């Protein structure tokens, strides 16, 4: 963990570095670190979300960080006194943003949904999110959430050899 990340685009045969600058992060150095599970906003091709190992969830639009969802504006919590891990980020077919927080069983409701109607708000708070628990699921950094665009089924696994498969 704590690895510096870059974001690049490919046009034809040319790669261009479009890594966001001045990124709010736990390290405090303005650098994007430890990206997990990037996903494009289905309503805006210039916007994407990236989970992170230390600093929650980033919303990036036109190559700039426009939001960092952390403990101050989401239900995310600090785990083990040092990290806020978001290993899985997805959109459902209605445009709702789903995230899972890896918390080693320390959070009651580690599955979180930011409804489409709230995503454009400037001041998003924890109360804007819907939270839920999933009995039997170990929300760890290997967990994965997939959402079918045609059926809207949600599949989750914790990524371990003894994993359960949950269908919502």
Which stretches of residues belong to each language-model region?
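Carboxylate-rich, polar loop motifs that coordinate divalent cations or form catalytic acidic clusters
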Residues: 1-168
């Amino acid at each position: 963990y704590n690895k510096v990340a870059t974001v690049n685009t490919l046009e034809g045969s040319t790669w261009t570095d479009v890594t966001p600058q001045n990124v709010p992060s736990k390290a405090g150095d303005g650098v994007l670190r430890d990206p997990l599970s990037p996903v494009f906003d289905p309503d805006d091709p210039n916007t994407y979300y990236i989970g992170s190992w230390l600093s929650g969830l980033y919303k990036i639009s036109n190559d700039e960080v426009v939001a960092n969802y952390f403990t101050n504006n989401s239900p995310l919590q600090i785990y083990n006194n040092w990290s806020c891990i978001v290993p899985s980020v997805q959109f459902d077919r209605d445009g709702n943003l789903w995230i899972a927080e890896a918390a080693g069983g320390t959070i009651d409701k580690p599955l979180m949904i930011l409804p489409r109607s709230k995503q454009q708000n400037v001041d998003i708070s924890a109360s804007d999110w819907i939270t839920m628990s999933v009995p039997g699921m170990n929300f760890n950094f290997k967990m994965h959430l997939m959402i079918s665009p045609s059926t809207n089924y949600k599949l989750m696994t914790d990524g371990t050899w003894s994993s359960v498969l949950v269908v919502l």
